[in-house]
Amino acid sequence: MAVKIKICGITSLADAWAAHDAGADAMGLVFYPGSPRAVTPQQVAQWRGDLPPFMTVVGLFVNATAQWIASTTALCSLDRIQLHGDESPAQCRAWGARAIRAIRVAEAADLHDLARWPVGALLLDAKIKGSYGGTGACFDWQLLGQAELPKPWILAGGLDPDNVEAAVRQVQPYGVDVSSGVESAPGKKDHNKMHRFVAAVRRAQDGAGL
């Protein structure tokens, strides 16, 4: 099965189409005002109908209310919901299989009991104090060799065109997620880097027989 590729932090229709043309499977929209890549539901609603067809649209939320997630999901026709804050398993349960739960990783203990999350997939990101992602930092991928990963899982945190090939070969994830690693500036995607990133993932999976 091909490794799935999600490009997060899309802030414009042009970047959405560039991600599609590069070969990404999914795009992420950040509905978190604290991020330099934040968009509003009203912005997205204006160009949602012009987004590439057959591309999964993921909305990223950080400690948002269930009501706001629901209204944003409806207005923007989101396919998946990524919960990237301090949400509990009970809060995740409301969204079921359409939810992706971000797990911030710094040590082996952060990967214990992942089966408790009632979601469709897990996203493993670097744990940086005071941050909810998008830092460009990696975590120690060797920790994954000791972990039980009961659901489809997505590798995130510090990935870029230069290291993602090695990452995919080493840990063989269901998918990879990139944001700052394919930017020219926060919130502005570098279209050449997106093409290079996707090409590196495909080289890795071809070499590993994935």
UniProtKB/Swiss-Prot annotation:
Pfam assignment, any one: PRAI
Pathway it works in: Amino-acid biosynthesis; L-tryptophan biosynthesis; L-tryptophan from chorismate: step 3/5
Keywords, in A-Z order: Amino-acid biosynthesis, Aromatic amino acid biosynthesis, Isomerase, Tryptophan biosynthesis
Enzyme class at the top of the EC tree: isomerase
GO molecular-function terms, A-Z: phosphoribosylanthranilate isomerase activity
Alphabetical list of InterPro entries matching this protein: Aldolase_TIM (IPR013785), PRAI_dom (IPR001240), RibuloseP-bd_barrel (IPR011060), TrpF_fam (IPR044643)
Catalytic activity: N-(5-phospho-beta-D-ribosyl)anthranilate = 1-(2-carboxyphenylamino)-1-deoxy-D-ribulose 5-phosphate
GO BP terms, alphabetized: L-tryptophan biosynthetic process
Entry's EC annotation: 5.3.1.24
Family designation: Belongs to the TrpF family.
PANTHER family tied to this protein: N-(5'-PHOSPHORIBOSYL)ANTHRANILATE ISOMERASE
Name the record gives this protein: N-(5'-phosphoribosyl)anthranilate isomerase
Organism for this UniProt entry: Magnetococcus marinus (strain ATCC BAA-1437 / JCM 17883 / MC-1)
Organism taxonomic ancestry: Bacteria, Pseudomonadati, Pseudomonadota, Alphaproteobacteria, Magnetococcales
